[in-house]
Amino acid sequence: MKHLLSTENLSLFDAVRVLDTAEEMSAVGEREVKKLPALRGRTVVNLFFEDSTRTRISFEAAAKRLSADVINFAAKGSSVSKGESLKDTAQTLAAMGADAVVIRHWASGAPHRLAATDWIDAAVINAGDGTHEHPTQALLDAFTMRRHWSQVNGTESTGADLKGMRVAIAGDVLHSRVARSNVWLLKTLGAEVTLVAPPTLLPIGVEHWPCKVSYNLDETLEAGIDAMMMLRVQGERMNASFFPSTREYSRRWGFDDARLRMLDDLGMKDTIIMHPGPMNRGLEISSAAADSPRSTVLAQVRNGVSVRMAALYLLLSGDSREAAPNVSQSSKETN
């Protein structure tokens, strides 16, 4: 892998490779000194044209745990706000010696454009482009699911896929780059995916995606699921009314207290509840569901650092087929 731009074209080998490397990286977070020397002397630039808290901080933590130098670039207050183009910004970063660029952009396809040009000779990681994709979010979601699925089945997670796992993704699919990346990646890993949303919040052409589509959340739950992922209603991307009211939306497509009890009533004791964040509590998910023992919300945040460490390591350390660095040995080098 030279870049990480999309999950649609990510092979099963590469997907499992990232997840397995993330397993190695997660051990770093359990140590007293949470650092490896793997990317010492490398420079990672977080190039964010959209506001972000979780993703930017997660990438920064990941890069620093690998001993890379990190430059955080926000469009607000920069030359971009004065009209500087993506090309000029990229060439400026190239002149500064950037080895990797983590880019979030409001325009779908911007990371692909950056990777396809000669503006900068650096690894490009898509941290979210418009409503298109968010590959590292999908990878950390898959990492979280794989750990849970392996625990349920009593198997090792390393080297495993998600064959047979039933995943429902509900909410604002139309504006969700997370949904798109998850559908492609989960299909590659062998999971069965069902999208649940009102017709107004489903994109044109969704019938051609490798998943099922439902308009009824209760029917989807009754059919049986192993993971329930709720998506945030992205009001900032809406310029029209996509549903009658927030109350009606919550009643029909939100994961409320009643649906939380339904999992128990249906005997689905191992079903987990996921959310990529940030959450609209009381709209797409109730506080009881978000804070329940079934919730993996905080685990997803924690796993995100490990997955992003893996992505940076595989892109910048040379041969992506090499094994992850020996954590115990590297511990001695950094102490």
UniProtKB/Swiss-Prot annotation:
It is an enzyme of class 2 (transferase). Pfam families: OTCace (PF00185), OTCace_N (PF02729). L-aspartate binds at residues 82, 177, 232. The keyword NADP does not apply. It catalyses: carbamoyl phosphate + L-aspartate = N-carbamoyl-L-aspartate + phosphate + H(+). Belongs to the aspartate/ornithine carbamoyltransferase superfamily. ATCase family. GO terms for biological process: 'de novo' pyrimidine nucleobase biosynthetic process; 'de novo' UMP biosynthetic process; amino acid metabolic process. Keywords: Pyrimidine biosynthesis, Transferase. One of its GO terms (cellular component) is cytosol. Carbamoyl phosphate binds at residues 54-55, 104, 134, 137, 277-278. This is Aspartate carbamoyltransferase catalytic subunit. It comes from the Bacteria.
